[in-house]
Structures are given as C-alpha cells and as structure tokens.
Amino acid sequence: MSTTDLTSPAHAAVESAGTTAIAEDLLARVLEPYSYKGCRYLLDARYHADDDSVLAYGNFTISESAYIRSTGHFNAVELILCFNQLAYSAFAPAVANEEIPQLRGWSLEDYFQHQLASMFIRNSSSRFNRPINPAKFSARLQCRNLQVVQRTWRYLLVPCAIEFWDEDGGAASGEVELAALNIP
C-alpha cells in the first residue's frame, strides 16, 4: 500500500463522517502504557472497520517530547509513537465489536494482553513534506488487505498507510507493516 492511496487532508472531515468516536475510557485503557511514561499524544479518535480494513482519524498534541528537548517540529520518533497510539486505539473497538474476522475469538481482555507483547512493526518508512507543529495536528490511518500468514510463526499481516497534517500546511506520511502474533 502506498501513502498516495490516502485521501488529501482537505477531505478528511468529510470522510470521517462514516466513522465512530472511540470512547475516552477505552482510549485511556489502550493508551495507559503511554500515559504511564508521560507520552500520551492522542487526544481523541474515530474509527471504522470492516472485514478487510481499518480506518481511523485522530487529533494529537505533543506539549513536551518524551525523549528529547523540543525540536519545535514533529519528527520520525514521534511519527511512530503517534502511529502506534492511533493504530492500537482503532483496533481495540474493532476487536471488541468483532469487526475483523481474523481477530474474532479475541476478547477485549485478550487484545490488551497481546497489545504490547504480540504486535510488531515489521518495517516502516516515512516522509516529511513540510514541518508539522506538534502543538496541534491530526492524522488519518488506513490499514487494508489484512491477511493471515502461515509460516514458522502464524501471524496477521497488517499493511498500513498514515498521513499527518496541521492547520498551517505541515505534512508527513508513512507506510508501516504490522504483524500481530498469537492470533485466534
């Protein structure tokens, strides 16, 4: 999947109309590992899932970087942290509502048990087109063509594309391939 498959940020508000808000109590639970370290950046999120895809939108703020003094702009480490937060948050309600066939059989408790220990980034790439203001920015995540891979380890392959933008024209994007182990 290519980030060129994503819709432009100008259309994000229209597109997100078909999504459902993720409740703050669920976000708080999903993002607890980040809150624990003082780096919860995701403020709120919306999602939609079907048999073969997960779509999510999120709004973020990074008041203070978790690992370095402020650079004044959104950077590669923060891109991955924000990707993780939006992806974990989007998959949680999809698992709870049994919207992803390959994960049916997992309860929400199973999801939380596997969230950190069984989900991996297999590879990633990112592009930074214009600096993004970390104080207020948004993202769109699209994961498509989910498939179970049967090798030495059986896992769910999740190809994702993500884009970030701010109100001043800042823009960045990335492609991330996830692997979820210990699937039902």
Curated annotation (Swiss-Prot):
EC number(s) per entry: 4.3.2.11
Catalytic reaction annotation: a (3R)-3-[(carboxymethyl)amino]fatty acid + holo-[ACP] + H(+) = a (2E)-enoyl-[ACP] + glycine + H2O; (3R)-3-[(carboxylmethyl)amino]decanoate + holo-[ACP] + H(+) = (2E)-decenoyl-[ACP] + glycine + H2O
Gene Ontology biological process terms from the UniProt entry: fatty acid metabolic process
EC category: lyase
Keyword NADP: no
Domain of life according to the entry: Bacteria
GO molecular function: lyase activity
InterPro entries from the UniProt entry: FcoT_ThioEstase, FcoT_ThioEstase_Rv0098-like_sf
UniProt keyword list: Fatty acid metabolism, Lipid metabolism, Lyase
Gene disruption phenotype: Deletion of the gene cluster mmaABCDE causes a significant decrease in the intracellular accumulation of zinc in Sauton's medium where metal concentrations are relatively low.
Similarity section: Belongs to the FcoT family.
Function, in words: Involved in the biosynthesis of a unique class of isonitrile lipopeptides (INLPs) that seem to play a role in metal acquisition in M.marinum. Catalyzes a Michael addition of glycine to the beta-position of an alpha,beta-unsaturated fatty acyl-[ACP], producing a (3R)-3-[(carboxymethyl)amino]fatty acid. Acts on the (2E)-decenoyl moiety loaded on the acyl-carrier protein MmaB, forming the product (3R)-3-[(carboxymethyl)amino]decanoate released from MmaB.
Name of this chain's protein: (2E)-enoyl-[ACP] glycyltransferase
Lineage: Bacteria, Bacillati, Actinomycetota, Actinomycetes, Mycobacteriales
